[in-house]
Amino acid sequence: MNGSQQICFTDSAGKALFSIPENGLLCLFYGNGDRHFAVCHRLDDTHAEIDGVNYSLPDFAKRMKHNQISFAPA
């Protein structure tokens, strides 16, 4: 896999928010003030492994919104 490939994160409606590089870090912000850093691996244009779990990127955003967790590049 090309090391310059990007993972494009979207909101729950599928609108592009930001990109991080393959093997980049995502910061998750919880409502109680906790933060968690997750390593991300690109699977294809719309899927990534985030902290060891495979996600469709729009589904990941929906899950984070439902759980009131915000996310941003680390």
Predicted regions and their residues:
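Intrinsically disordered, low-complexity, charged/polar segments
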Residues: 53-74
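Generic low-polarity alpha-helical segments
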Residues: 1, 7, 24-26, 38, ...
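Acidic, low-complexity, intrinsically disordered interaction modules
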Residues: 20-54, 58-60
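Mixed-charge, Lys/Arg-rich low-complexity intrinsically disordered regions
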Residues: 1-17
